[in-house]
């Protein structure tokens, strides 16, 4: 399927668009992560970014993509509440890989938010959703518009949570192609790739964290816990960036 034809999927009605996406996802399911990235770089619209939380295993997708497109913009949404170790990790990887880092934040500072709304993360699911919208969803939407993004690479995996079990490799959200190259990777495959390529993991990994977000809504992984229970007090897994 030609790049020209794929770019024009958005002009089709929903039924035709979904049929083509189903065919493309079947194709991508037979590819390796490296092949998916190469295919996307060649066939999808060329105003491309990747997003990264610079979390526990974020180095994997960063390494896979920058090998093929070193100057790709790497979008980070900074809530102002990341762990100090995360900020240090961002600086370290940016310098090591010469990343084209693009940082976006809420238009309201964290201090001003607390003065205006209090500690939203302590106000149940509604407070968390409002917090995520201000600090993650709105800045990401601004980034997508500011950078005129047509194709978005992200590192979601099906084994991370129940909410990600049925995700496709390729989707279209608000006219933007979204590609998930390591969607089918297991934790073991992630660990093997990190080891084989001598890549760094987040400093908090060795302190018992399996997933890292904001300081106030991230817990250490305790025996018997699911990874998704370490975030947002177990009330939810997604922050809104990757929801419909």
UniProtKB/Swiss-Prot annotation:
Pathway: Sulfur metabolism; hydrogen sulfide biosynthesis; sulfite from sulfate: step 3/3. This is Phosphoadenosine 5'-phosphosulfate reductase. Pfam families: PAPS_reduct. Its main location: cytoplasm. InterPro entries: PAPS/APS_Rdtase, PAPS_reduct_dom, PAPS_reductase_CysH, Rossmann-like_a/b/a_fold. One of its GO terms (cellular component) is cytoplasm. The gene is cysH. Catalyzes the formation of sulfite from phosphoadenosine 5'-phosphosulfate (PAPS) using thioredoxin as an electron donor. GO terms for molecular function: phosphoadenylyl-sulfate reductase (thioredoxin) activity. It comes from Buchnera aphidicola subsp. Acyrthosiphon pisum (strain Tuc7). Keywords: Cytoplasm, Oxidoreductase. It comes from the Bacteria. It is an enzyme of class 1 (oxidoreductase). The keyword Transport does not apply. The active site is at residue 239. Its EC number is 1.8.4.8. It catalyses: [thioredoxin]-disulfide + sulfite + adenosine 3',5'-bisphosphate + 2 H(+) = [thioredoxin]-dithiol + 3'-phosphoadenylyl sulfate. CDD domains: PAPS_reductase (cd23945). It is found in: Cytoplasm. One of its GO terms (biological process) is sulfate assimilation, phosphoadenylyl sulfate reduction by phosphoadenylyl-sulfate reductase (thioredoxin). Belongs to the PAPS reductase family. CysH subfamily.
